[in-house]
């Protein structure tokens, strides 16, 4: 069926499935493709080894949007990502190119495709207070508070997932509303304005994939992962 909608390509897959290699291969073969990273860690400067970020040489030869976009001392929420990615898609089409969104952050893909609810933006002051409470009371205390304010969210978030607990409490405190109510006022989903071409890399041999993941872990450690984390912790007091 023919469509007049401009195309947007999604390339999804788990860790160590070869997404970057596929994206670069497509760019070489078809041309006029601009790669947009859909990764919650590659977006940060300095998180190079831990995120298995493409090498500087690769990024120079095959530029990736939303890689090294911001620093760890800046908040770059999923809302920021969706807004930036949507703008990038428009700009790429204006250049008569095709956006190829590549990554493994399935939540980001889902929100781009189906629309982002109009949740309140992150509040640095409130976030700092919540982080201070974690230091004093422990994360379990905040998870218990979330259980009172929004049991559904609390049940879906592990008690050790600090970032998601903080965000859920931000939403509860800033809006005074349940996220499901806020979902009614959602942004325009990409699926309604673009022709989405979705491709997935899902290895059938799970054992081999796990071997590749384990091999990557050892390689990253040998490349200096521990030292990178220590350096980031020292620089940003993580």
Name each region found by the language model.
Residues 1-238:
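Phosphate/pyrophosphate-binding catalytic cores of soluble transferases and nucleic-acid-acting enzymes
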